[in-house]
Structures are given as structure tokens and as C-alpha cells.
Amino acid sequence: VRVYFDTGVFIDYLSTRGSANALLRSSERRGRAPADIAADAERLFEKVGRIHIGATSCLTYYEVEEALYRLLAQSAKGISRAETLLIPAARSITTQVQIVVELFNISVLDLTPGTVRLQLQQLDLQTRGIRAADALHAATAIAFDAELLVSADDAILNLDGILVNTQGRKIVCRDTDLALQLL
């Protein structure tokens, strides 16, 4: 099975691996505690890495760092030079994503003009209000011929059965716990 991972799955996995990362997943999602969410992400990465084909977009690197930076910056308001000093802390999660990619044999797909064109051709993404980053992830999953798109994002999950890969197959969109049941 060709499995595409949205950024949220990496955040799920890394949220229990570092004190700053824990800020990214501090509340329940769909009745699951952050520790359970992280465990589901780990099991999914392991399973896909062993017997399936996994991929994500290079956009994931930007999104994880920016998400952590925003949270750290909120807590450092009013502190001189905080923005500069927070960059190394936020950048560390990008390094961690690279390690996850290597540990679980996940391909990192380029964001190309073709990906942007594909995004622009997907009228459903526009009419359903799917914003730029999510739309680029959806287009990348389509181009990858994903059969399963795993996401923590409701906007992406609501695209279940709507996205069609280049082979003409509908893409199933699931959160980590339900993706594990499918695989």
C-alpha cells in the first residue's frame, strides 16, 4: 500500500520525544490522549516502513519547524532577542523529522511546479476551502499515487474518498488509529 503522511503524523510521533515538542500535542484528539496518539504514529511508521511504501512532502520540514517556532515565540513574548535564540530550538524538530524519515524508510517528495499545477487543477480543494499547505499535501499524495493519506487535520480527513490518485483510485484519508486498522 502506498501511504502518504501529512505533517501532523510527524508531530504526533515527535510530541513525546522532547520537552519543547510536547507543546505541539498537549490535548486529546478524537478521544485519545497525546501519549496514545504518539504510540499510534509510531506503530504506523513501523508498519509502513516494514511492508508498505511511505512518503511525505518536503513541505513537512517547514511546517514542523514553523509550528514549534510559533509556540515557542508565544511563550517568549517580551524577551529581548528571543526570536533569534528560538531558531535553534525550533530547528531541532526538523532534524528529528529527518531522523524519522531515515528510520522508517519514508520518501521525501519534492514540491515542484507540477505539484502546484496539480493543486490548482483540483477544484474540490478550492471549493471545500482547503488552504495552501493542506492542498499541496493533497496534490503531492495524488501525484505519489497514494492509496492512503494519513493526517491529523480535519480538513484533510474530510477529503476521504474525494481525492483521486493518478491511477484513478480514490484515496482513503484517515487519522493514525484508523489507518492502523486498514493496514
Regions found by a protein language model. Give the residues of each.
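Short, well-structured N-terminal submotif of metal-dependent ribonuclease cores
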Residues: 1-60, 68-81, 177-179
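Anionic, Ser/Thr-rich low-complexity intrinsically disordered regions
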Residues: 9-10, 48, 56, 83-122, ...
